[in-house]
Amino acid sequence: MLPFIRSDLAQFTAYKPHPSSDTDAAVPAQLDRLDTNESPCDLPPELKQKLAWTFQQVIESNRYPDGGHEELKDAIAQYVNESANISSSPITAANISVGNGSDELIRSLLIATCLGAQGSILVANPTFSMYGILAQTLGIPVVTVSRNPENFEIDLTAAQSAIEQTQNPPIRVVFVVHPNSPTANPLTTNELRWLKSLSEQILVVVDEAYFEFSQTTLISELVQRPNWVILRTFSKAFRLAAMRVGYCVAHPEAIAILEKVRLPYNLPSFSITSALVALQNRAILLESIPQILNERAKLITALSKYPELAVAESAANFIFLQLKTDNKNSPDTALLNLHQQLKNSGTLVRQISGGLRITIGTPEENIRTLNHIQTALIKA
């Protein structure tokens, strides 16, 4: 390795945008790409035409984008208040920071809290992998606890013990997803009670990437909890994964710090415009959610009929599928075989932590997925 590179980076591997791919090449479009929790619906043609017109007539390619994001922040604040039914003490632009995807915001939060041996982070696996990955790339220790295998609730006893015993550096940030990825379960009453009990010295990051599908939010907690941050994204329900726009909602003092550490001009003009157009037309874009939820219910019902499979309830736009005990193969081997057979059949899903995470696709994609799973189980 080059002598000027940090030695701990030698153990890392580059993140594959599509983990189901054997190479770094882009996944062919003819495959059913159900491995990254994207929306199955592209933007409507009329919105694409509006964006094309904006690019041609309004955006000046030779000029830097709006680095303050004020118009976008105002629009986001309005949507947050509307979606959380907040009338008193409403969210304002001062409560919003915008990032190049939620990943940038996660990285900024880590820089603001833990960099320079100031803190560690706590995550409960399985969960969104980027919390740990981004922390490790910054040299920040990652403390992990497990989850209850039955309902995927965080092992709260282990989590509390980790917070009490971890020193030099202490745990400064706890990351949770609501609902969790890959297991699709929302935070439980016990988990919420524990999060609320944590010291204000600890930052609690609640990732609501799938809020539009769960319709369960903790935005109202921010008024009385200045140590809480809520993350959201335009990549899922708003169909803008290609534009990389995420945002967080937090106390104005926390937002002021994030604005200090984020990169200048971090969002391209086209991404800013796309997010604004999406918010202005949110009623149209969010019309796809009932169909996705209906398809999710149909997929869970169909898969639950197979005695070999355990299918968890879902509050997101994906399901978590596990294999029951197989006398022929170890659970890991059986899961690997199923994953590979699905891929060979043209269905990409995510293999992770003892199960398969399957994004809800179009009705046609879901039918093919069911057929491919059925065929794979017959061959097993």
Curated annotation (Swiss-Prot):
Gene3D superfamilies, alphabetized: Aspartate Aminotransferase, domain 1, Type I PLP-dependent aspartate aminotransferase-like (Major domain)
Modified positions (N6-(pyridoxal phosphate)lysine) in chain numbering: 236
Keywords associated with the record: Amino-acid biosynthesis, Aminotransferase, Histidine biosynthesis, Pyridoxal phosphate, Transferase
E.C. designation(s): 2.6.1.9
Pathway(s) served: Amino-acid biosynthesis; L-histidine biosynthesis; L-histidine from 5-phospho-alpha-D-ribose 1-diphosphate: step 7/9
Reactions this protein catalyses: L-histidinol phosphate + 2-oxoglutarate = 3-(imidazol-4-yl)-2-oxopropyl phosphate + L-glutamate
SUPFAM superfamilies: PLP-dependent transferases
BP GO terms, sorted: L-histidine biosynthetic process
Enzyme kind, highest EC tier: transferase
Record GO terms (molecular function): histidinol-phosphate transaminase activity; pyridoxal phosphate binding
Cofactor(s) of this protein: pyridoxal 5'-phosphate
Cystine pairings recorded for this chain: none
Keyword Amino-acid biosynthesis set for record: yes
PANTHER family: HISTIDINOL-PHOSPHATE AMINOTRANSFERASE (PTHR42885:SF2), HISTIDINOL-PHOSPHATE AMINOTRANSFERASE-RELATED (PTHR42885)
Subunit structure: Homodimer.
Family: Belongs to the class-II pyridoxal-phosphate-dependent aminotransferase family. Histidinol-phosphate aminotransferase subfamily.
Name under which the protein is recorded: Histidinol-phosphate aminotransferase 2
Taxonomic source organism: Trichormus variabilis (strain ATCC 29413 / PCC 7937) (Anabaena variabilis)
Name of the gene encoding the protein in the UniProt record: hisC2
